[in-house]
Amino acid sequence: MHLKTKVTLFAIGWLVLISAAHAYLNVNWAAVLNDYQPVEKRKITVAYLPVTCQLTCPVTDYISKYSTSGEEFMPRMFQGFPEIKEALISNRVQAAFIVAPLALALKAQGVPIKVVYLGHRYGSAVVVQKNGPIKTFADMRGKTVAIPSRFSDERLLLFRAMKVWGIKPGEIRMVEMAPPDVPGALAAHAIDAFAMGEPFPSQAEIGGFGRVLFQAREYWPDYMSCILVVRQDLIDKRPDVVQVLVDGIARSGLWLDTSKPHREDAADFVGRFYYNQKPGLLRWALTKPMDRVTYSPLAPRKADFDMVRDLMIETGVLNKKLEFSEYTDTRFSDNASMQTSWKYEPGIATAK
């Protein structure tokens, strides 16, 4: 065999090997195989971000693998809300954890979705540079603050605080930024502050470059941010699957609120297997203190959503007065109210 032929064959073999390795390591084969299942047997795909406001999504997926019911859905992590929005519209995901104002905005635009459950209460904060010039909210005038989306509860939270301090809308510059990017931006002094959900406020605290100016509950009692939405076609065709999803999320919320060991265990397996974050960071966010973010009860309430809607209209991101019944389906949360916590002891499967 000539040298040229040997080199060519070697190159082809190497290319095949690299391609195979890439496919093995980077292709989600479970998702690929799921797409070939009959529609009525496919597991639904649920979108989420690596934030504690959406912790019940990976917790439900992880614990259900060790329960008698088995895996209930396929979680898919994204890095920002714009990507989730597009995936939801195109039916690449059938359910998603998104911020409440975005859900209302999508519904107003005609996107066929319904809110079926909340993701949490509390868990967001405004963080400033630790040794920076901002000592009180009054010092925010003229400063740049990162928010996850113009359709976010964090943006509305800032407006509520601005009202209290007599700050006009144009006096604070708000910029949209993917949540995982904000700690680095604050550390690099690219922004003066950020309003985000955990664990990013905790990351700034642990890193020594950020200080929590205030928690969301200080300006917004019973604060909520992330909620669970489901496409209408899934509700119409497979309501039983939607109920199983909501039941699982409800059980995870109760499980997380049961004890500190439960939260510490969740910090370990979610940090390692889902969020790609240090478990110590999540432990800080989930336990210092325990009510920094809560996960029960999480049934959608009309008063909460009416307030979000009215704030959106007031701040110019919604031009339609949607009624609660137009964008929610509460039968699933009503049924889930009878659920109990997962019977799962911390540490049972974490080491596997």
PLM features: residue spans?
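Short, Lys/Arg-rich N-terminal segment immediately upstream of the first membrane anchor
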Residues: 1-5
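Secondary-structure end/capping motifs
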Residues: 236-320
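Soluble non-cytosolic domains of exported or imported proteins
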Residues: 78-82, 97, 148, 152-153, ...
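Short, glycine-/small- and polar/acidic-enriched structural segments
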Residues: 23-168, 173-176, 192-198, 209-214, ...
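Solvent-exposed, polar/charged alpha-helical surfaces in well-ordered, non-transmembrane soluble domains
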Residues: 55, 86, 90, 104, ...
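Conserved C-terminal helix/tail region of periplasmic/extracytoplasmic solute-binding proteins
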Residues: 310-352
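Hydrophobic membrane-insertion alpha-helices, especially the h-region
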Residues: 8-24
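Pocket-lining segment of extracytoplasmic ligand-binding domains
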Residues: 101-102, 132, 180-275
